[in-house]
């Protein structure tokens, strides 16, 4: 059995591999990877990042986004979101963006992975999953990056605050808010808290 065939037998469908992951099974990893990409076994996603595709009735399926980002970062702690998620808040954002944002601790910048562009943002703190409270704080953090009128969005944010869980919102603001977001939202939240207490 050839070394390439031996390497091929160790691969699992649907998995994303770094070049370094394949070193344990190959004595000539670069040559073997080139051969596997050439014969269609592996797909090159980015420099040093490869995918062994699952096959469906429609052909090869793309890698799962979480597996792709996890392999790229070599880390499990990240949050993938999109400016499109702001539209779910009902605060007047309606634009659709072809952009994915990855909050993480390791990388910063734009990277093309598997044909999609991801904006990696190195942040000290971010939640494990997206919540409406985090989204609202994140929207105010990134207000300068949305296409809609900022005053209009902020007016709608102040209205939306009234329907949200104040404790969760204050915690999200404290943990994830920029100084600008804190200066804009803290007075509104304090006013709501006083009104809620009365």
State where each predicted segment sits.
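A short, charged helix-loop
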Residues: 114-122
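Alpha-helix initiation and N-capping motif
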Residues: 1-4, 30, 62, 66, ...
């Amino acid at each position: 059995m050839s070394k390439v065939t031996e390497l091929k037998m160790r691969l699992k469908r649907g998995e994303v591999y770094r070049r370094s992951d394949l070193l344990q099974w190959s004595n000539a990893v670069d040559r073997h990877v080139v051969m596997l990409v050439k014969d269609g076994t592996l797909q090159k996603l980015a420099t040093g990042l490869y995918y062994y595709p699952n096959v469906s009735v429609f052909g090869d399926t793309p890698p799962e986004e979480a597996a792709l980002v996890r392999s790229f970062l070599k880390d499990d702690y990240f949050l993938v979101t999109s400016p499109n998620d702001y539209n779910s808040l009902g605060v007047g954002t309606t634009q659709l963006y072809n952009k994915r944002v990855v909050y993480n601790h390791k990388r910063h910048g734009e990277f093309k992975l598997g044909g999609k562009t991801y904006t990696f943002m190195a942040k000290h703190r971010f939640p494990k999953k997206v919540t409406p409270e985090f989204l609202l704080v994140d929207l105010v953090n990134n207000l300068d990056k949305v296409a809609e009128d900022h005053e209009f969005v902020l007016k709608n944010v102040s209205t939306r605050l009234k329907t949200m869980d104040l404790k969760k919102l204050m915690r999200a603001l404290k943990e994830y808010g920029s100084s600008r977001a804190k200066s804009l939202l803290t007075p509104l939240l304090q006013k709501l808290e006083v009104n809620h207490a009365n």
